[in-house]
C-alpha cells in the first residue's frame, strides 16, 4: 500500500483557481486512479531512473476493500508554496496478484516510433503472449521479465529523434478531417487494454505532458513540461474529480456487464461510445494522445460549466469550493447514482490544450459501472471527439453546445442547468448506444431543418402572393426626405418581391441602378450613346417581361383592393353595430351627444376609406406614369441617336456614290478602238471597259467634300477637281482638257456661296443643319454634273464635225490609203505567223533545237515531189504514143506541164 503524501498540498494549491499544471522533475506523473483517495491498493512507486510508462495488467481484479470517504474539506485555499515529491505512478488492481507486477528494466527495451498495437482484446483474457529468446527459453511477454538489450548511446539518440519525428507526423495525420482515429471506441476494449510503449528517457517523457483526472486526495506534480512541437501553450488544468461512493459488489457487477456489452458491440461491428470507468482510465490517455490536435488553439476549446452539488459528483480541482458544499457532497452524489439522471460534464483541458477525457459520459461514477446501455451515452467535447464522429455530427446542434452556449451555461444556476440537460440532451443522448443510433439521432435534426426551410419557403411564397399595402408610400416618403439614392433593406425586399407593382420589373430600384431615376434633361448627368444603348436594352427586356403577366397582375391587384375595401367596411360596420348596441348605456345628455358624434365619425370614416382607396390608386397610377416617362425618355433619346447616325451614314454613302461616279466618268475617255460614243452609251458600258483605278488615288482626296463634324467647313466639292485631273490617266484627251477651265470657273462661281453657307452653320452636330446642307450640296452637284455632261457632248459633236471635214478633204488620196491598208494587212499576217512560231517555241522548246533539220527535211520532200511529178507526166505521154499507132497527141506544152498529163490521158479514153 502506498500513501499519497501530497494530497493536502494538492488541494491547497489547486484551490486557488490557477489554470496551470504544476510539475516537478523532468517527467509528467501519470495518475491512474480508481480506488480510495488516501490509499490505493495494488500499486508500486517507481523512481525517476525508470521513467517508463506503466504496465497495465490484462485481467484486473476488483479491489477487495471498501472505499473510504473523501479527503477533509475545510482547507486553506491561499497556500502558495507547494512542495513536490518525486514522480509516482499509481496503479489499480490487487497487490497480491502476480499480474500487477511491472517490468524492472523498461528503459532497455527497443523503441518503436508508433504505439504498440495488439489485438489482445480480440482474444480470451486468460491467453498470454509468448516468445522465445536466443537461448531457447520461452518468455511470457505479458508477465515475465524481458531480457536486456544492449543499445549504444548513438542508437538511443537516433531512436529519440525518430520518436519525436513520428509523433509529429502522426499528430498531423490524425488531425486531418475525416480521419478515423485508431483509438476509436470500437477498437480498444475497456476490459483488455493494449500495452504501451515505455518511454525511452526522461527527455521523451517530458514531451508527453498529459494530465488525467485525479482524485482529490492525490497529487499531480511535475516540472514545467515542455509541450509538443506545434502544440499550443498550456491553457490550464481543469481535471474534474469523480467522487467514488460505491462498494465492491457494484464494481464487480459493472465489470461483468461492461465485458458483455463490449463483446456484443464488437461482434456486431458497431462503434460504441463508452463512459470512462475507474479501472480503465489509462485508455483515456491513449485516446487523448491519438486525438491530440496540435492546430487547436486553447481559446477555441470551450470550458465546461462549473460543477457543484448538482453536477453529477464532479468537482474541478482549480475552482475553490466552500466548506459546507464539500462536506455535504456525498448526499447529492448518492441521489444521482440511484436515480441515474444523465447530467452534462464539461470538457476538461490538459496541459497541451487537449481534453484529457476522450469520452465525457453522461452517467456519473456514482452509478454502477455497467449501467446498461444508458451509461454509454456521452457528450463528446469538440476537441476530444474522434474524427469519424466529428465528421458525422456537424448537424447535431442541440447535442453539442458551442462556446457561447457553454459560457452562458456556466453562469446559470446548477439546478437550471440540470433541468436543461435532463430535458434535452439527456432525453436524446442517453438513448444512443452506437453509431447507428447516433445517425438515427442526427436524422431528426436534419428533418427539422428541412421542415423549417419548407415553412420559410411557404411563408415567402405567401408574402409574394399577398404582398404589403401600398409599398410605394415609404419609397415616396424617402424621396421627399432627400435620400433618393439610399434604400432601406425593407424597401428593396418589397420591390424585389413585386407582388402588387403594376410594372414590377421596371421599378425605382432598376431606374436608380440605370441612373435614370431623375429627368434626363435636368439634373441627371448626360449619358453617353453606349450607356443609353445599354439602358434601352434592359428597359426593353423589362417591358417585354411585364407584358406577359400584365393581365393576371391587374386582376390580382383589383381583387386585393376589393377585399381590402370590403374588410374596411366590415370593420366599420361592426364598430358601428357595437356602438349602437350600447345605446342603452348612454343615459346622460352629454353621453348622447358623444354617441351621435361617434356615429358621424363612423360615416366620415366610410367616406374617407372609399376616397383613400381611389386616391391611392390614382397615386399609384401617377407614380407609374412618372416611372414610365423616365424610361420612355431614355428610349426616345436612343431612337434620336439611331436616327442621327442613320442620316449621317446615309449622307456619307450618297457622297461616296457620287465620287465613284465622277471618277468613273473622268477616267472613261474615248474608246480604245477610236470610235466615239455618246453619253448614253458611255453610261451603259461603264462597268464593262472601265479601267481599274486604285481607291487611294481617286477617292481619298474626296473625303472632305461633305462637312462632317470635326472637319473644316471651307472644303467644297469643286476645288478638288484639279486633283482629279492630275491623278487621271496619262492619256490626255483634248476635249477633257479643254473642258476643265470652264468647270473650274463654274466651281469658283458656284462654290463660293456654298462655302459661305457651310461656314455659317454653327454646330455640325445639329441634325437639321446637316440635312439642309446635304440637300443643298446634292442639288449643286447635280447641276454641276449636268453642266459637265453637256460640255462633253458639245465637244464630242465638234470633234465629229471636224473628223467629217477631214475625211472629205482627204477623199482624193483614197488609192494610197488602200495600198497602205493592204500593206498593213500583210504586216498583220506576218506578225501572225511570227506569233505562231513564237507560240510553237514556247509550247515545244525542243522543237527549236532541231529547226534546221526540219527545214532540210521539208526541202527534200519538196524536191522529191517535183521529180516524181515530172517523171509521171513523161511516162503518160510515151504510153499514149505507143497506143495510138504512132500518132502523138501530146503537145510540147503538155509535155512540159506534168500536172496536165492526167487530164490529157482521160480525154482519148472518152473518145
Swiss-Prot record:
Positions where Phosphoserine occurs in the chain: 118, 393, 683, 696
Coiled coil: 547-645
Compositional bias per record (Polar residues), positions renumbered to this chain: 68-86, 183-212
InterPro entries registered for this protein in UniProt: MRVI1
Compositionally biased residues, Basic residues: 111-122
Effect seen on changing residue 393 to A: No change in the inhibition of calcium release and no change in phosphorylation efficiency. No more calcium release inhibition
GO annotations of cellular component type: membrane; perinuclear region of cytoplasm; sarcoplasmic reticulum
UniProt effect for mutating residue 118 to A: No change in the inhibition of calcium release and no change in phosphorylation efficiency
Source organism, top-level taxon: Eukaryota
Post-translational modification: Phosphorylated by PRKG1/cGKI-beta. Phosphorylation at Ser-696 is necessary for PRKG1-induced calcium release in the cytosol.
Region spans: Interaction with PRKG1: 152-184
Keyword GTP-binding: no
Compositionally biased spans, kind Acidic residues: 802-825
Transmembrane segments: 853-873
Effect of residue 176 to A: Drastic decrease of PRKG1 binding. Disruption of PRKG1 interaction
Self-association and partners: Interacts with PRKG1/cGKI-beta and ITPR1/IP3R type I. Part of cGMP kinase signaling complex at least composed of ACTA2/alpha-actin, CNN1/calponin H1, PLN/phospholamban, PRKG1 and ITPR1. Interacts with HCN4; regulates HCN4 channel activity.
Record-given protein name: Inositol 1,4,5-triphosphate receptor associated 1
Species this chain originates from: Bos taurus
Gene: IRAG1
Amino acid at each position: 500500500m502506498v500513501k499519497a503524501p501530497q494530497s493536502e498540498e494538492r488541494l491547497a494549491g489547486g484551490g486557488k483557481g490557477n489554470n496551470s499544471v504544476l510539475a516537478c522533475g523532468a517527467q509528467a506523473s501519470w495518475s491512474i486512479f480508481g480506488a480510495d483517495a488516501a490509499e490505493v491498493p495494488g500499486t508500486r512507486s517507481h523512481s525517476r531512473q525508470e521513467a517508463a510508462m506503466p504496465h497495465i495488467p490484462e485481467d484486473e481484479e476488483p479491489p477487495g476493500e471498501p472505499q473510504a470517504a473523501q479527503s477533509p474539506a475545510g482547507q486553506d485555499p491561499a497556500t502558495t508554496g507547494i512542495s513536490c515529491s518525486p514522480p509516482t505512478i499509481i496503479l489499480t488492481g490487487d497487490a497480491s496478484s502476480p499480474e500487477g507486477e511491472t517490468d524492472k528494466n523498461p528503459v532497455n527495451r527497443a523503441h518503436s516510433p508508433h504505439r504498440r498495437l495488439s489485438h489482445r482484446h480480440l482474444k480470451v483474457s486468460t491467453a498470454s503472449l509468448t516468445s522465445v529468446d536466443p537461448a531457447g527459453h520461452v518468455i511470457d511477454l505479458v508477465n515475465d521479465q524481458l531480457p536486456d538489450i544492449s543499445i549504444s548511446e548513438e542508437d538511443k539518440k537516433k531512436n529519440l529523434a525518430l520518436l519525436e519525428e513520428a509523433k509529429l507526423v502522426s499528430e498531423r495525420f490524425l488531425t486531418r478531417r475525416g480521419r478515423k482515429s485508431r483509438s476509436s471506441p470500437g477498437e480498444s476494449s475497456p476490459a483488455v487494454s493494449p500495452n504501451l510503449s515505455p518511454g525511452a528517457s526522461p527527455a521523451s517523457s517530458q514531451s508527453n505532458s498529459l494530465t488525467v483526472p485525479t482524485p482529490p486526495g492525490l497529487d499531480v506534480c511535475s516540472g514545467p513540461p515542455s509541450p509538443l512541437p506545434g502544440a499550443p501553450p498550456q491553457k490550464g488544468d481543469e481535471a474534474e474529480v469523480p467522487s467514488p461512493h460505491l462498494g465492491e459488489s457494484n464494481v464487480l457487477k459493472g465489470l461483468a456487464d461492461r465485458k458483455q456489452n463490449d463483446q456484443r458491440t464488437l461482434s456486431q461491428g458497431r462503434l460504441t461510445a463508452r463512459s470512462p470507468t475507474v479501472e480503465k482510465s489509462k485508455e483515456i490517455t491513449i485516446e487523448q494522445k491519438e486525438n491530440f490536435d496540435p492546430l487547436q488553439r486553447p481559446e477555441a476549446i470551450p470550458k465546461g460549466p462549473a460543477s457543484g452539488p448538482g453536477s453529477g459528483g464532479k468537482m474541478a480541482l482549480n475552482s475553490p469550493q466552500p466548506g459546507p458544499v464539500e462536506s455535504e457532497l456525498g448526499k447529492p452524489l448518492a441521489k444521482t447514482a440511484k436515480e441515474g439522471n444523465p447530467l452534462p460534464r464539461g470538457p476538461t483541458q490538459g496541459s497541451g490544450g487537449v481534453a484529457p477525457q476522450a469520452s465525457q459520459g453522461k452517467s456519473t461514477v456514482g452509478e454502477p459501472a455497467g449501467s446498461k446501455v444508458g451509461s454509454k451515452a456521452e457528450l463528446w467535447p469538440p476537441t476530444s471527439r474522434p474524427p469519424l464522429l466529428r465528421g458525422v455530427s456537424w448537424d447535431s446542434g442541440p447535442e453539442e453546445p458551442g462556446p457561447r452556449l457553454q459560457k452562458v451555461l456556466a453562469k446559470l444556476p446548477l439546478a437550471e442547468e440540470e433541468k436543461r440537460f435532463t430535458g434535452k440532451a439527456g432525453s436524446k443522448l442517453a438513448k444512443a448506444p452506437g453509431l447507428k443510433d447516433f445517425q438515427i439521432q442526427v436524422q431528426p435534426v436534419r428533418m427539422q431543418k428541412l421542415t423549417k426551410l419548407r415553412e420559410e419557403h411557404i411563408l415567402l411564397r405567401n408574402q409574394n402572393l399577398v404582398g404589403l399595402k401600398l409599398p410605394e408610400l415609404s419609397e415616396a416618403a424617402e424621396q421627399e426626405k432627400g435620400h433618393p439614392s439610399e434604400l432601406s433593406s425593407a424597401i428593396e425586399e418589397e420591390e424585389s418581391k413585386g407582388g402588387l407593382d403594376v410594372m414590377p420589373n421596371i421599378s425605382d430600384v432598376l431606374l436608380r441602378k440605370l441612373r435614370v431615376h431623375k429627368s434626363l434633361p435636368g439634373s441627371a448627368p448626360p449619358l453617353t450613346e453606349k450607356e443609353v444603348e445599354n439602358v434601352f436594352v434592359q428597359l426593353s427586356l423589362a417591358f417585354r417581361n411585364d407584358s406577359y403577366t400584365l393581365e393576371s397582375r391587374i386582376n390580382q391587384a383589383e381583387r386585393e383592393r376589393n377585399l381590402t375595401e370590403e374588410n374596411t367596411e366590415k370593420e366599420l360596420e361592426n364598430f358601428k353595430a357595437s356602438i349602437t348596441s350600447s345605446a342603452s348605456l348612454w343615459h346622460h345628455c352629454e353621453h348622447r351627444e358623444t354617441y351621435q358624434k361617434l356615429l358621424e365619425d363612423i360615416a366620415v370614416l366610410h367616406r374617407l376609406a372609399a376616397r383613400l382607396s381611389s386616391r391611392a390608386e390614382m397615386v399609384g397610377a401617377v407614380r407609374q406614369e412618372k416611372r414610365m416617362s423616365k424610361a420612355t425618355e431614355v428610349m426616345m433619346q436612343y431612337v434620336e441617336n439611331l436616327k442621327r447616325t442613320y442620316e449621317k451614314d446615309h449622307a456619307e454613302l450618297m457622297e461616296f456614290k457620287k465620287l465613284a461616279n465622277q471618277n468613273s466618268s473622268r477616267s472613261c475617255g474615248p474608246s480604245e478602238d477610236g470610235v466615239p460614243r455618246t453619253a448614253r452609251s458611255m453610261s451603259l458600258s461603264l462597268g464593262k471597259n472601265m479601267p481599274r483605278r486604285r481607291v487611294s488615288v481617286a477617292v481619298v482626296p474626296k473625303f472632305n467634300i461633305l462637312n462632317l463634324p470635326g472637319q473644316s467647313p471651307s472644303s467644297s466639292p469643286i476645288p478638288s477637281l484639279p486633283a482629279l485631273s492630275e491623278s487621271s490617266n496619262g492619256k490626255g484627251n483634248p476635249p477633257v482638257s479643254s473642258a476643265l477651265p470652264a468647270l473650274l470657273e463654274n466651281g469658283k462661281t458656284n462654290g463660293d456661296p456654298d462655302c459661305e453657307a457651310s461656314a455659317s452653320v454653327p454646330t455640325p452636330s445639329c441634325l437639321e443643319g446637316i440635312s439642309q446642307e446635304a440637300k443643298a450640296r446634292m442639288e449643286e452637284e447635280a447641276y454641276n454634273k449636268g453642266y459637265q455632261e453637256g460640255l462633253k457632248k458639245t465637244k464630242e459633236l465638234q470633234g465629229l464635225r471636224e473628223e467629217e471635214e477631214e475625211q472629205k478633204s482627204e477623199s482624193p488620196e483614197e488609192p494610197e490609203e488602200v495600198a497602205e491598208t493592204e500593206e498593213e494587212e500583210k504586216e498583220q499576217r506576218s506578225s501572225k505567223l511570227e506569233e505562231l512560231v513564237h507560240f510553237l517555241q514556247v509550247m515545244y522548246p525542243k522543237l527549236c533545237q532541231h529547226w534546221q533539220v526540219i527545214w532540210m527535211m521539208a526541202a527534200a520532200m519538196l524536191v522529191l515531189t517535183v521529180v516524181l511529178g515530172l517523171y509521171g507526166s513523161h511516162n503518160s505521154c510515151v504510153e499514149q504514143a505507143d497506143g495510138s499507132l504512132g500518132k502523138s497527141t501530146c503537145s510540147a506544152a503538155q509535155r512540159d506541164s506534168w500536172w496536165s498529163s492526167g487530164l490529157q490521158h482521160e480525154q482519148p479514153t472518152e473518145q
